[in-house]
Amino acid sequence: MAILVRLFFALFVVSVYFFRVRLRLSHIPGPFLASLTNINRRQWVTTGRAHTIHTELHRQYGKVVRAGPNTVFVSDPAAIPAIYRFNEPYQKSEFYDALMPYVRGKSIPDVFATRDEHIHRTMKQPIAAIYSMSNLVSFEPYVKSTIEYFFSRLDSLFVETGKVCNFGLWLHLFASDVMGEITFSRRLGFLETGGDMENVMANNWKFFVQAAPATQMPWLDYFWKRNPLLPGSVKPNKVIEFGVARIQERLHLSEKHPDHVNSRDFLSRFIAAKEKNSQIGPDAIMTWANSNIQAGSDTTAILLSALFYHLLKNPTSLAALCTEIDAAAKRGCLSSILTWKETRDLPYLDACVKEAARLHPPISLPLERVIPESGTVIGGFKIPGGTRVAMNPWAVHRDRDVFGADADTWRPERWLEGEEKAKTLYNSLLTFGGGHRSCLGKNISYLEIYKLVPSILLRYEIGLAEPEKEWHLENRWFVMPSRFYVRLKARNGVTKL
């Protein structure tokens, strides 16, 4: 009898739990399993195709979809200002805990992943101005020197030999060395070796392969990956170790040969910011530098690859961009390596960059926020307090009501159909997040992209090595492309570097 009572009580508790969970968001459409468990959405991420799965979910169920017992996905661009606010912002959810740097058995708060608004403000305020475009243009000579070295490597390895170039890889190597130049006053050896220095890129990717599914069920990450009681669960962070080694090298260089150091590079400014603010924790310099290494090169490389890939897949668009660049060059308006100022007068280039940022946002998992206790209304649906609400940039950028019936296709001209429309489209982007927690480093990406793309097209004729084949995309937080191969030829009149 006692066993039956216990069994009945257990069934009662479980029934009440599932009844409550099921009904809490029952008015919001979505897959049935989503009302009972988060296993489904974890599995979506595990496939590496979450960006397309989430887009298909919205096409099937609408712009507001129940994705978990306490999670709602939204794809309506009109909801961006409400969810990703500048004033009275919604707090980030435990989703971000899996993305937090983990060193010496503890989480190290950083500007991006921390959920604590006070920590975020304390860490962001001293360095925010460094990332402004008005400041970043002072780094142009260092970006220019890396572009020149990049071109010399392309010339000797691919132009002169006729070999096929793994363009996605080389764009990644370029972006990694630019980050080294502006952060540590030196390239990190990626272009020189033509490969992954100390497996930094591979280790970074491995981190996100493990972290991405954990964002959907964070308690699993707490138990398996960050539990000091489990042997082997707390492992060294190879990417952070690489960054720490570069910091130590840089500090040693500044002591021995201060004239060899750019006193205005990111690391110098990070050190100065730390010295001026006693509230900043001891690991701040490490996490600031790590953010540049871990996120800065990936986002830039992905956007560069997306832009070139879609240009090469759309010859009419490529021809239009080359015509614009060549015409400006003939008027004497362009340097061989374009300056930021010179790129401001190339409207079709600007449209192509924005279209790449729309069609292929590098980060394409839903960016979660927590609805406050008072609740809210999104897309006509009441969302109770405590609900996790999120938007996947990939799905948002394919909203046909805003971006048109051809939202799934490459068409830069959509950005040139009037200032008001262009403004609406731009305000509908989540490429670098939204609100006061948007990505600090987005201007670094744009500086590199706007300088490199026209400079490459002035110098080379580029064609897909296998134009009949599609590239491969895998989403592990970053939607990383692979199998992007090209052939390069020097254009007439181009001199060897």
Curated annotation (Swiss-Prot):
Positions annotated with a glycan in the UniProt record = 443
> Where does this protein hold heme?
439
Q: What does this protein do?
A: Cytochrome P450 monooxygenase; part of the gene cluster that mediates the biosynthesis of cichorine, a phytotoxin active against knapweed, corn, and soybeans. The first step in the pathway is performed by the non-reducing polyketide synthase pkbA that condenses one acetyl-CoA starter unit with 3 malonyl-CoA units. PkbA also catalyzes one methylation step to produce 3-methylorsellinate. The nonribosomal peptide synthase-like protein cicB, the cytochrome P450 monooxygenase cicH and the O-methyltransferase cicE are involved in the conversion of 3-methylorsellinate into nidulol.
The terms under GO molecular function for this entry are: heme binding; iron ion binding; monooxygenase activity; oxidoreductase activity, acting on paired donors, with incorporation or reduction of molecular oxygen
> PROSITE patterns attached here?
CYTOCHROME_P450
- Annotated compartments: Membrane
Q: What class of enzyme is it?
A: oxidoreductase
In the bilayer, the protein is annotated as: Single-pass membrane protein
Q: Which InterPro entries match?
A: Cyt_P450, Cyt_P450_CS, Cyt_P450_E_grp-IV, Cyt_P450_sf, Cytochrome_P450_monoxygenase
GO CC terms for this protein? membrane
Its GO biological process annotations read: cichorine biosynthetic process; secondary metabolite biosynthetic process
Know the name of this protein?
Cytochrome P450 monooxygenase cicH
Any idea of its EC number?
A: 1.-.-.-
Q: Which cofactor does it need?
A: heme
Say where the protein is mainly found: membrane
Keyword terms, alphabetized: Glycoprotein, Heme, Iron, Membrane, Metal-binding, Monooxygenase, Oxidoreductase, Transmembrane, Transmembrane helix
Pathway note: Phytotoxin biosynthesis
Q: Which gene encodes it?
A: cicH
Query: What does gene deletion cause?
Result: Abolishes the production of cichorine.
Q: Which family does it belong to?
A: Belongs to the cytochrome P450 family.
Judging by the UniProt lineage, the source's domain of life is Eukaryota
Residue ranges spanning the membrane: these are 2-19
Q: Which residues form a coiled coil?
A: none
Taxonomy of origin reads: Eukaryota, Fungi, Dikarya, Ascomycota, Pezizomycotina
